């Protein structure tokens, strides 16, 4: 496994570990908050029980100690019934007192003279009593509506808090499950890379067919290149034959001869002065096709030059896997396509491509 792969895998593991720690922290905070809310609600209920027990003789507490006060719920129904009866008595008494108060208020004039109301059967007394009853009912309805509204708000807010907590817990659970899946995938990746390093990877039928197709395609490209070389050599042979046949019938072309000698001298000088023959073998120049061919180790490199710039780079190697050869070809074309410095390309290849199995990085 390469250092880059190991560092990447270690980075994945660190990210998963940090995410797991954050998820555990959030889950713990939610549980702590829920426990705090539960204890707070129990404390409020406990204080309410104590207050009811202290202020209401109908509720009899069971005192175990000073810190724990409990109420027997079996006696609540009887106490509530007694309390309702007492409330009715108080209500009647209150109404009588309020009626009497209103009666006196409306029947006494500014000059302290009593109005002519003989008894409670008087129509004016009945009307005033009815108005008092209506006001009382309206006030009670208003208070009951407020109580119902407050109860509804409390229930709604409590439901929202519970739903939010449940949603957070569900999200934490999903994230935890996702983290577990990530760990599983990371372990599978480590196993796959270990198996790959050991060279024990078995290719599936589809991938094996693809590799064979790439190999056949590589051979076809090499065949086309050899055909092109053969065509160039055949054209050169024909040209030389024509020159030889016509050499006895006409004066020699001094300009062509001079160009030929100059080309051979430049070719020889470049091979001797600029090429490291310990690394580069079989250097050939093809001016007619604009190509340069040489071999490093077991790989043949063909550089196509068009308009003083490299237009294409081809690699041929029967011993190198087709996928690695394709990757090296793509990398070289990506690096040097369009450049005019052929020497820099050759130097790079001799230094980086001396071992054909290693891909270019």
From Swiss-Prot:
It is found in: Nucleus; Chromosome, Centromere, Kinetochore. InterPro entries: Kre28. Pfam families: Kre28. Keywords: Centromere, Chromosome, Coiled coil, Kinetochore, Nucleus. GO terms for biological process: homologous chromosome orientation in meiotic metaphase I; regulation of meiosis I spindle assembly checkpoint. Residues 126-160, 220-246 form a coiled coil. GO terms for cellular component: kinetochore; Knl1/Spc105 complex; nucleus. Acts as a component of the outer kinetochore KNL1 complex that facilitates microtubule-kinetochore interactions and the spindle assembly checkpoint. Kinetochores, consisting of a centromere-associated inner segment and a microtubule-contacting outer segment, play a crucial role in chromosome segregation by mediating the physical connection between centromeric DNA and spindle microtubules. Belongs to the KRE28 family. Component of the KNL1/SPC105 complex composed of SPC105 and KRE28. Part of the ten-subunit outer kinetochore KMN network that includes the KNL1, MIS12 and NDC80 complexes. This is Outer kinetochore KNL1 complex subunit KRE28. It comes from Eremothecium gossypii (strain ATCC 10895 / CBS 109.51 / FGSC 9923 / NRRL Y-1056) (Yeast).
């Amino acid at each position: 496994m390469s250092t880059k792969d190991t560092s990447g895998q270690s980075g994945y593991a660190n990210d998963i570990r940090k995410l797991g720690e954050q998820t555990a922290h959030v889950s713990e905070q939610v549980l702590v908050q829920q426990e705090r809310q539960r204890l707070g609600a129990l404390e409020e209920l406990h204080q309410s029980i104590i207050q009811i027990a202290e202020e209401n003789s109908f509720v009899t507490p069971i005192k175990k100690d000073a810190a724990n006060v409990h109420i027997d719920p079996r006696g609540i129904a009887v106490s509530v019934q007694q309390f309702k009866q007492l409330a009715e008595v108080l209500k009647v008494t209150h109404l009588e007192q309020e009626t009497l108060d209103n009666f006196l208020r409306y029947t006494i004039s500014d000059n302290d003279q009593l109005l002519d109301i003989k008894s409670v059967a008087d129509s004016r007394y009945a009307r005033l009593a009815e108005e008092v009853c209506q006001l009382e009912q309206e006030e009670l309805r208003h208070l009951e509506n407020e109580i119902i509204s407050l109860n509804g708000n409390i229930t709604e807010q409590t439901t929202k808090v519970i739903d939010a907590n449940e949603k957070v817990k569900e999200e934490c659970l999903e994230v935890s499950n996702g983290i577990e899946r990530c760990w599983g995938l990371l372990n599978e990746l480590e196993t796959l890379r270990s198996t790959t390093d050991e060279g024990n990877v078995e290719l599936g039928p589809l991938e094996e067919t693809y590799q064979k197709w790439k190999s056949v395609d590589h051979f076809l490209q090499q065949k086309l290149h050899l055909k092109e070389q053969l065509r160039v050599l055949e054209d050169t042979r024909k040209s030389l034959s024509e020159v030889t046949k016509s050499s006895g019938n006409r004066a020699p072309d001094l300009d062509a001869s001079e160009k030929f000698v100059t080309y051979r001298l430049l070719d020889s000088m470049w091979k001797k002065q600029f090429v490291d023959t310990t690394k580069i073998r079989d250097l050939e120049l093809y001016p007619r096709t604009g190509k340069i061919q040489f071999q490093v180790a077991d790989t043949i490199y063909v550089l196509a030059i068009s308009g003083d710039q490299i237009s294409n780079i081809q690699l041929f190697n029967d011993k190198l896997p087709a996928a690695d050869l394709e990757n090296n070809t793509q990398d070289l074309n990506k690096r040097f396509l369009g450049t005019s410095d052929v020497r820099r390309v050759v130097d790079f290849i001799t230094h980086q491509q001396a071992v054909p199995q290693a891909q270019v990085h």
